[in-house]
Amino acid sequence: MNSSFHLHFLDLNLNATEGNLSGPNVKNKSSPCEDMGIAVEVFLTLGVISLLENILVIGAIVKNKNLHSPMYFFVCSLAVADMLVSMSSAWETITIYLLNNKHLVIADAFVRHIDNVFDSMICISVVASMCSLLAIAVDRYVTIFYALRYHHIMTARRSGAIIAGIWAFCTGCGIVFILYSESTYVILCLISMFFAMLFLLVSLYIHMFLLARTHVKRIAALPGASSARQRTSMQGAVTVTMLLGVFTVCWAPFFLHLTLMLSCPQNLYCSRFMSHFNMYLILIMCNSVMDPLIYAFRSQEMRKTFKEIICCRGFRIACSFPRRD
C-alpha cells in the first residue's frame, strides 16, 4: 500500500505476488513493516468456491417457488454482491498471473485503469452488501412487528423496486469511484458510509430484539395468529443477525486499514496493522464463502433445494431427504 492514499489492489497484489516469488523479506516502499504475502492460488481458490456457492444460492431461489419471497429476493441481491467480490478477485488474480509471467504486456497507465475497475467492483460489492443487509433487516422488522399487514406492505413489486434502487445506487457509487479514484474524499466517503450503515443496522437489531419477544406474545394471543409463523420470523431475524455478524467481522479490518491509511500511514503501529492487507482481502472473500453456508445451515428449504440442484437425476434415491412425520 503506498502513501498516496489510493486503494490500488492490483498494484498491491502484484507486489505481494512478486514477494512470494522472490522471497519473504519484501517490504512496502512506504511502510517500515514487511507486507504479508499470500499466494495468488489462495485468492483464486476462494474466488472460485464463492462464485460457485453463490450461483447455487441464486439458482435455488429461482428454482424453488417456496423461496419466492421478499426476504429471499434480498438474499439473492446479497449473493450477487458476494459474486461480484469473487469475480473481481478471480479476474484480478488471472491478470496478476498474466502480467507476472509476461503473457500480458501493457502500459502502467492502463494497469492503473484496470486497477480502478477492480477497486470499483469492491466498492459496489460492499455498498450492495450493506444495502441488501439493511433491506433484509427491514423486511424482518416488518414481518415481526406488522405480521398481519406484511403481505400488503412488502409486496413482490415493492421488493423488486428496492433491489433495483439498491443496484442503481451502487452502480453510481462505482462510477464515482472510477471518475474520482485519485481523491481521498472518495475513500473517506466509503469509510463513513460503512460505519454509518453498520451503526444503523446494529441499532435496528437491538431495537428489534428488545421488542420482539413481547410483540410475538401479543400477536400469538390474537385470534387466528400463527405461532409457527412468528417462530419462522424470529428464525429469519436470527439468520440475518448471523449474516450481519459475519459481514462485520470480515469487512471491519479492511475499513480499519483504510482509516489508518488516511490517518497515520507512517506510524509504526499503523504500519504493522496495514502490512496484513492481503489477509483482510482474504477475510472479505471468506465472507462471500460463508454466507451461502449460513443460508444452508439456517434454512431447511434452502438445503433441500441445494441437494436437488447438486444431485443428478439418477441419484435421487441416494440424495433424497428423510421425510418427517
UniProtKB/Swiss-Prot annotation:
Topology relative to the membrane: Multi-pass membrane protein
Cellular component terms (Gene Ontology): cytoplasm; plasma membrane
Keywords: Cell membrane, G-protein coupled receptor, Glycoprotein, Lipoprotein, Membrane, Palmitate, Receptor, Transducer, Transmembrane, Transmembrane helix
Lipid-modified sites (S-palmitoyl cysteine): C311, C312
Transmembrane segments: 38-61, 74-97, 115-138, 156-179, 187-211, 240-265, 274-297
Subcellular location: Cell membrane
UniProt-annotated glycosylation sites, renumbered to this chain: N2, N15, N20, N28
InterPro entries, per the entry: GPCR_Rhodpsn, GPCR_Rhodpsn_7TM, MC3-5R, Melancort_rcpt_5, Melcrt_ACTH_rcpt
SUPFAM superfamilies in the cross-refs: Family A G protein-coupled receptor-like
GO terms (BP aspect): adenylate cyclase-activating G protein-coupled receptor signaling pathway; G protein-coupled receptor signaling pathway, coupled to cyclic nucleotide second messenger; regulation of metabolic process
Protein name according to UniProt: Melanocortin receptor 5
Organism for this UniProt entry: Homo sapiens
